[in-house]
Regions:
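A short, surface-exposed helix-loop junction/capping segment
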Residues: 48-54, 124-134
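A cross-family detector of function-defining hotspots
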Residues: 2-114, 145-193, 197-201
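Short, structured interface segments
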Residues: 109-128
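Long, low-complexity, intrinsically disordered C-terminal regions of large eukaryotic nuclear proteins involved
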Residues: 132-147
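Generic beta-strand hydrophobic packing signal
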Residues: 119-121, 139, 195
Length: 201
């Protein structure tokens, strides 16, 4: 008598914790020590972070992948807020979710009228004071978001990121002595990772 094949075990749900590990996995290239501390704070192993990232990539590239908005709603639940937003000629909605690892931040998805996610990144929570950004010394890893750096050191010029979840900004910023320097800042998921200063190693 032929043996029945073993029943396929249902996949465990992809949780908000898993999503936070995905955010960290992309940041580990630039700031491994910060990521390690955050991972311990979440009570997750390196293996768990890698597995979360593997499952995330599989979801993104699945033949019948969900639309980004549906995917985030399934993983993160109902958005904390949904707000109309006008960016140039583009009318869209901003969906915000809390991120327990960073209580002062929110994960924002900008959705165009056709339902396509136009942008997905971390922003400062509404009503939460942002960092004081005046000199190069203030631009420490994880200290600010893309829009905060762009406002503090305007005019800033967007730079092409090295991956879909990475952004760059070019601007000038003073050092402690007031001498201005040309800078290139790198962000992952909208959060500052490092700043390169022209003429410095």
């Amino acid at each position: 008598m032929d043996r029945m094949p073993p029943a396929k075990r249902p996949a465990t749900p992809f949780t908000p914790l898993d999503f936070q590990l995905v955010l960290l996995r992309r940041m580990a290239d630039h700031n491994p020590d910060l990521v390690e501390d955050a991972r311990h704070q979440l009570g997750a192993s390196i293996a768990a972070m890698r597995e979360a990232n593997r499952r995330w990539q599989a979801m993104l590239h699945a033949p019948r992948s969900r639309a980004a908005t549906s995917r985030y709603r399934q993983i993160l639940g109902t958005p904390e807020s949904v707000t109309p937003r006008q960016i140039g000629d583009l009318a869209c909605e901003a969906l915000l979710w809390p991120v327990p690892l960073w209580p002062d931040l929110r994960f924002e998805v900008l959705v165009a009228p056709n339902g396509i996610a136009w942008n997905e990144w971390l922003v400062r929570a509404p009503g939460t004071p942002g960092p004081v950004l005046e000199t190069l010394d203030d631009l420490t890893p994880w200290s600010c978001t893309v829009d905060e750096a762009a406002r503090a050191f305007a005019p800033a010029r967007p730079l092409e990121g090295t991956a879909p979840t990475r952004w760059g900004l070019a601007f000038t910023a003073p050092d402690k002595s007031g001498v201005r320097h040309d800078c290139a800042a790198e962000f992952t998921w909208g959060l500052l990772q490092r700043v390169g200063v022209k003429g410095r190693p």
